[in-house]
Amino acid sequence: MHILKKPDLSDPKMRAKLAKGMGHNYYGEPAWPNDLLYIFPVVILGTIACVVGLAVLDPAMLADKADPFATPLEILPEWYLYPVFQILRVVPNKLLGIALQTLVPLGLMLVPFIESFNKFQNPFRRPVAMTVFLFGTFTTIYLGIGAAMPIDKSLTLGLF
């Protein structure tokens, strides 16, 4: 209600304050034309100059031409897909590998219901959620490291 209420201009105290400039932003410098006309274009042109300068000084090198007949021995996905790739690569039945990947979001959706009795926000006071988080983090890191290795060393990470 206070936002929509208009000032009472018939009040002499209010008119005296407005006459002195109170109630308005009378300090600093105005945005037009100082900021919008002078400072913003300088910043925009400076940014463009930096980008063009970096592109000229350090151009991106062109790679070799694509050769469809020379494929690498093992094609790896992007780094963020390594754990999923490792599951599909190691599990013998591909349908089971896809089922394992659908269990991950289902398991994450069950965590709040498993620990619904515990209303604490401190993660150290929520043992089930903390255990699921740590297990998932370590499993994801383990699978990601294993995906970057050859298939015979991927499960043991070459340690034994």
From Swiss-Prot:
Entry annotated with the keyword Isomerase: no
Pfam families: Cytochrom_B_C
A GO cellular component annotation in the UniProt record: plasma membrane-derived thylakoid membrane
Subunit structure comment from the entry: The 4 large subunits of the cytochrome b6-f complex are cytochrome b6, subunit IV (17 kDa polypeptide, PetD), cytochrome f and the Rieske protein, while the 4 small subunits are PetG, PetL, PetM and PetN. The complex functions as a dimer.
Compartment list: Cellular thylakoid membrane
Signal sequence bounds: none
Xref: InterPro entries: Cyt_b/b6_C, Cyt_b/b6_C_sf, Cyt_b6/f_cplx_suIV, Cytochrome_b_C_euk/bac
CDD domains to which the protein is assigned, alphabetical: cytochrome_b_C (cd00290)
Family: Belongs to the cytochrome b family. PetD subfamily.
Transmembrane segments: 36-56, 95-115, 128-148
Entry's Gene Ontology molecular function annotations: electron transporter, transferring electrons within cytochrome b6/f complex of photosystem II activity; electron transporter, transferring electrons within the cyclic electron transport pathway of photosynthesis activity; ubiquinol-cytochrome-c reductase activity
Matches recorded under SUPFAM superfamilies: a domain/subunit of cytochrome bc1 complex (Ubiquinol-cytochrome c reductase)
Mode of membrane association: Multi-pass membrane protein
Entry keywords, A to Z: Electron transport, Membrane, Photosynthesis, Thylakoid, Transmembrane, Transmembrane helix, Transport
Protein's recorded name: Cytochrome b6-f complex subunit 4
Organism for this UniProt entry: Synechococcus sp. (strain CC9902)
GO terms classed as biological process: photosynthetic electron transport chain
S-S bridge residues: none
Job description of the protein: Component of the cytochrome b6-f complex, which mediates electron transfer between photosystem II (PSII) and photosystem I (PSI), cyclic electron flow around PSI, and state transitions.
